[in-house]
UniProtKB/Swiss-Prot annotation:
GO molecular function, one term: metal ion binding
EC class of the enzyme, as a word: hydrolase
Chain ranges of the HD domain: 30-142
Predominant subcellular localization, coarse grouping: cytoplasm
Taxonomic lineage of the native organism: Bacteria, Pseudomonadati, Pseudomonadota, Gammaproteobacteria, Vibrionales
The protein's name in its UniProt record: 5'-deoxynucleotidase PBPRA2627
Amino acid sequence: MEKSHFFAHLARMNLIQRWPLMRSVSTENISEHSLQVAFVAHALALIKNKKFDGNTNPERIALLGMFHDTSEVLTGDMPTPIKYYNPAIAEEYKKIELAAEQKLLSMLPEEFQEDYAPLLDSHCINKDDYVIVKQADSLCAYLKCLEELNAGNHEFAQAKKRLEKTLQTRSTPEMEYFLNTFVESFNLTLDEIS
């Protein structure tokens, strides 16, 4: 039986720090971030289905959220201002991400690669599901900015402004519902939400 290093790599998600160029009050790794994205993506899918006549699979979308940054165990987390500095860099980095996805997929025993491809390979992911995960990813980054700003860390002020624009461009009724229903609580203290 051939040995697989797939899950040993995934276990290293907790070693990949997000926001590597930012001074953070509370550090965040991609494992923590991916779980939060899964929670939020699941909620967005439920909201879409229950409030806006959607027909999504919330559990599948939650899984996509869990796996959405797994390629970063091979690439690290590239800061957004660098990743999208210009179209050429963005295009080249996308190629690196795709290669990392394929490398991760190849680490699995062959009989499971087909099962994991729709979670790991961005070419195989349903585009409508991907949109929801990207919305959740942006929302979670925005929530991180709120957390840092509320802790007095102004390092995240520009990131918050940038993410507000991103949220506007990715806006959907379910995202607006989430923002209006859940986000204000992130500005409150533990006593205020208890």
